[in-house]
Amino acid sequence: MKKILVADDETSIRLLYSEELKEEGYEVYQAANGLEALEIVDKIPLDLVILDIKMPEMNGIEALRQIKEKRPDLPVVLSTSYGEYKQDFATWASDEYLVKSSDLEDLKAVVKRYLKE
């Protein structure tokens, strides 16, 4: 079973994404900030990380940088409510950029693209 980490400071988003991904057959872990995300990356052989950009304690951009230092092969999808970040996406080392939405089809499509069986 493929393992996904959902890191977001908004509990409702974490739960929404986690439940949807579990229904799709993935094992899902959750983190409320970048520091928690790094701890999980260190302990669990993940297949994908979905990372919010704005989080307390350590933001998603810094967490992304550290994740890619440790696991350059691990796909990381940046997720945000702020569409204006799209112009900055190319300068970050993430694999994908996703604007949060209640329509989870984009999320599922991105996950399937990176976790093809």
Specify the residue positions occupied by each region the protein language model found.
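Conserved sequence signature across two-component system core domains
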Residues: A7-D8, A31, V49
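Short hydrophobic/Thr-rich beta-strand motif most characteristic of the beta2 strand and flanking loop
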Residues: G25-A32, I40
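Active-site residues of response regulator receiver
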Residues: D52
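Receiver (REC) domain active-site loop signature in two-component systems and cognate sites
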Residues: M55
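Hydrophobic/aromatic residues positioned on beta-strands within the core alpha/beta folds
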Residues: V77-S79
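Alpha4 helix (beta4-alpha4-beta5 surface) of REC/receiver domains from two-component response regulators
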Residues: E62, Y82-K100, E105-A109
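Charged docking surfaces used in two-component/phosphorelay signaling
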Residues: L15-E23
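Acidic catalytic/metal-coordinating carboxylates
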Residues: N33-E36, N59-E62
